[in-house]
């Protein structure tokens, strides 16, 4: 039987969903670890899209490969076919149909909605409701959407647990298919391209009518359903999502007739962190001390840039972004630093949003990969390779936002993130896929200028500092931002 292209796209999207994979001992606090580079003793995990923050972060992996694959195949193996693996030891003999000479996996039909060639992916379980990870160990009971009981310690899975898993998976598949089948072929193409590129090609908006979808007895708006399916398996509520500034849902009314369901047009909001670190002798103003103009270790370009920023910040702009006389003034300038050396010229930003990246499949902005330096340390080279899709910096009505598009965390400090009246430096960790308001216009207006005796070295109340992959401050071995291999300085020009 011939199948339409639309049904093939729907099946490919279903196979591209992600599976949570718990990491033991993971914590997203600011107290050090290998991922943020505070200790630097072990290498980073393989570059996968680890979405989430806080304790128990999840590593999410695509069920299907990112490359296009022929979706035409035969029907069949609907029950047992949902359990598939990509290599590894055979199923336990306690499972029905797992004999010595044959296996349920051996009769897999390549075109079925739940099937995958053995060499394409290391994920061995299906859907969001899997009880076991790739190594065969029982999953944590707190896994999102996993409503079934875990396997008893003394034997195989009970019939009730298997039955409930299949029901939950079938419900998710039914709700997802009902939503995707409402989309036109062009919208499905856009959605698939965004999912398979992991946001490298976010594409346009995918608009759907606001529907009363329900999953597990709970409301599941389209943006929540697809965000949970393709990016954040632990996502619980739509209020945790923030539409990006270029999305239809950003400007549309909250109760409008349509909503964008492209999961890469949304970011996840950074929630409150653990209590601030204990009092430190370092203050936010001490952070700026290494950039003091009298510091003899600064290069000529650094000193020239700092002096120029104080006297005439409007004189600097990237050559390719030189504005005409009719264009409005830039709202910020971006400086890229490697440790204590500024690399390249200041990049002036005129548009509402700008991408700052090392390697991006499609798009424009500030490409850090094109900035050359004769001598780079090994730590800088490693960190530059982790920038990837980088960040999206946007000026919005309430402030300046930074969205982490990469696969590694970023670390942010700004005057409006510091505790009012506090002297301890506050550095916020932003996991992949999350966004944070790095500069709050309202809070900035309420803050008083620092007292003269408190200002130790140059202090700019309208600047933001962002480090890629490596943290700094009281909770890390790096006390100063200039100890970070790759970081940005965002110099706001007349905030608001």
UniProtKB/Swiss-Prot annotation:
BP terms from Gene Ontology: anatomical structure morphogenesis; aorta development; aortic valve morphogenesis; BMP signaling pathway; cell differentiation; cell-substrate adhesion; coronary vasculature development; fat cell differentiation
Effect of mutating residue 490 to T: Risk factor for CRS7
Outcome after substituting residue 98 to V: In CRS7; uncertain significance; no effect on inhibition of BMP signaling pathway
Residues that bear Omega-N-methylarginine: 75, 82
Modified residues (Phosphoserine): 435
Residue ranges of domain MH1 in the record: 148-275
Result of changing residue 435 to A: Loss of in vitro phosphorylation by PRKX
Ranges of Basic residues composition bias in the record: 1-15
Function noted in UniProt: Transforming growth factor-beta superfamily receptors signaling occurs through the Smad family of intracellular mediators. SMAD6 is an inhibitory Smad (i-Smad) that negatively regulates signaling downstream of type I transforming growth factor-beta. Acts as a mediator of TGF-beta and BMP anti-inflammatory activities. Suppresses IL1R-TLR signaling through its direct interaction with PEL1, preventing NF-kappa-B activation, nuclear transport and NF-kappa-B-mediated expression of pro-inflammatory genes.
Family of this protein: Belongs to the dwarfin/SMAD family.
Protein name, as recorded: Mothers against decapentaplegic homolog 6
């Amino acid at each position: 039987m011939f199948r339409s292209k639309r049904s093939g796209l729907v099946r490919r999207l279903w196979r591209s969903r992600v599976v949570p994979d718990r990491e033991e001992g993971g914590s997203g606090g600011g107290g050090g670890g290998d991922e943020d580079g505070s200790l630097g003793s072990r290498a980073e995990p393989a570059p996968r899209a680890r979405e989430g923050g806080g304790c128990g972060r999840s590593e999410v992996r695509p069920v299907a490969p990112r490359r296009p694959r022929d979706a035409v195949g035969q029907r069949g193996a609907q029950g047992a076919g949902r359990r598939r693996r990509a290599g590894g030891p055979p199923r336990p003999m306690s499972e029905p149909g797992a004999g010595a000479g044959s296996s349920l996996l051996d009769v897999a039909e390549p075109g079925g909605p739940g099937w995958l060639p053995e060499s394409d992916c290391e994920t061995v379980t299906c859907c969001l409701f899997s009880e076991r990870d790739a190594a065969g160990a029982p999953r944590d009971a707190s896994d999102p959407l996993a409503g079934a009981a875990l396997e008893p310690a003394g034997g195989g899975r009970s019939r009730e647990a298997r039955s409930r898993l299949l029901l939950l998976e079938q419900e998710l598949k039914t709700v997802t298919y009902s939503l995707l089948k409402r989309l036109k072929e062009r919208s499905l193409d856009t959605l698939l391209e965004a999912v398979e590129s992991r946001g490298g090609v976010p594409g346009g908006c995918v608009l759907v009518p606001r529907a009363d979808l329900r999953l597990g007895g709970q409301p599941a708006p389209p943006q929540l359903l697809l965000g949970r399916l393709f990016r954040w398996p632990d996502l619980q509520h739509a209020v945790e999502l923030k539409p990006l500034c270029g999305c239809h849902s950003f400007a549309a009314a909250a109760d409008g007739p349509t909503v964008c369901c492209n999961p890469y047009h949304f970011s996840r909001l950074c929630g409150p962190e653990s209590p601030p670190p204990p009092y430190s002798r370092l203050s936010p103003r001490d952070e700026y001390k290494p950039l003091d103009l009298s510091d003899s270790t600064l290069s000529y370009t650094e000193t020239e840039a700092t002096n120029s920023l104080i006297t005439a910040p409007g004189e600097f702009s990237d050559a390719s972004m030189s504005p005409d006389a009719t264009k409005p003034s830039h709202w910020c300038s971006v400086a890229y630093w490697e440790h204590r050396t500024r690399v390249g010229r200041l990049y002036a930003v005129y548009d509402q949003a700008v991408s700052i990246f090392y390697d991006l499949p499609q798009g424009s902005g500030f490409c850090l990969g094109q900035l050359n330096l004769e001598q780079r340390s090994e730590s800088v080279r490693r960190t530059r390779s982790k920038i990837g899709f980088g960040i999206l910096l946007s000026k919005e009505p309430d402030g300046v936002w930074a969205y982490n598009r990469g696969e590694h965390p970023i670390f942010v400090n700004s005057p409006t993130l510091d505790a009012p009246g506090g002297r301890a430096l506050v550095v916020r960790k932003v996991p992949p896929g999350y966004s944070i308001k790095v500069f709050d216009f309202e809070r900035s207006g309420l803050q008083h200028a620092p007292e003269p005796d408190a200002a130790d070295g140059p202090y700019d109340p309208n600047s933001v500092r962002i480090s890629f992959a490596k943290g700094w401050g009281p909770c890390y071995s790096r006390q100063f931002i200039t100890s970070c291999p790759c970081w940005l300085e965002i110099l706001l020009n007349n905030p608001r």
